[in-house]
Amino acid sequence: MQFSAGVNLNYFYDRAVNKEFKDIDIFLNNFQQSLYQLQHAKFPVVSCPSGLAIGGGYEVISQTSFIAAHSNSVLGLVESLVGLIPAGGGCKEMLRRWANHSDIKNDPKLLSLKVFNLIGYATTADSPIKAKAQQFLGDKDVMVMSKDRLIEEADKLIFSNKENYHPLDNASFSLPGSTVMSEMMDILNELKDKKVIGEHGIEVGKKLGYMLSGGDTNSSTRL
């Protein structure tokens, strides 16, 4: 059984074909606001993925207080494989998770490029151990060997953290803005030359790069 492989793309395809773009906007806004409320709840929330937790499925678990992941969990943001970018907070979460990592050393350009490659290449981790290395799981998250113990481990996380619990503050980090876009375009053009991606892949990469670079900003501005 899978946790979630993300949203039903047929829903979006049908509405795009019928030019019902307002319905798409409403769906995405509701999804984003629901996950924001989940992340900022006044009590701890634990997700217990098993099997696939990718795309929108990963965006859900990434915004819970704690994750108790079964050992066979596969985690990642794979939207680029179908010509999309994560739209439920996944980009923000990966920036948050990598911002203070020792590999990044508080370098806004390194941060943007790291997450750009991670999401752009649709990187997945096929175990919780690998997921921690990619920051899909954090230090406070746990791996559970038996599915039968997922709820038990979730209960432990809740009861051991319910006293004086405080939800995460809003994500905040510095991003380089347009200064990193040329490097991102070099990556995209190389992939196009190798026939790994086509014109649409370039457009998807540009949108992803604009988002992860911070757009019209610079590294002296805290977002």
Question: What role is predicted for each listed range?
Answer:
Residues 1-22, 32-48, 70-74:
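A structural preference for short, pocket-lining loop segments at secondary-structure junctions
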Residues 2-5, 33, 53-57, 76-77, ...:
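Flexible loop/turn segments at secondary-structure boundaries
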Residues 100-123, 127, 145-223:
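Intrinsically disordered, low-complexity segments enriched in small/flexible residues
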Residues 46-54, 119-123:
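Glycine-rich beta-to-alpha transition loops that act as phosphate-gripper elements at the mouths
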Residues 55-109:
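CoA-thioester-processing core
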Residues 66, 119, 124-139:
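Long hydrophobic segments that form regular secondary structure
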Residues 8, 60-61, 130-131:
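Hydrophobic/aromatic residues within transmembrane alpha-helices
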Residues 22-45, 55-59, 64, 106, ...:
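Phosphate/diphosphate-binding loops
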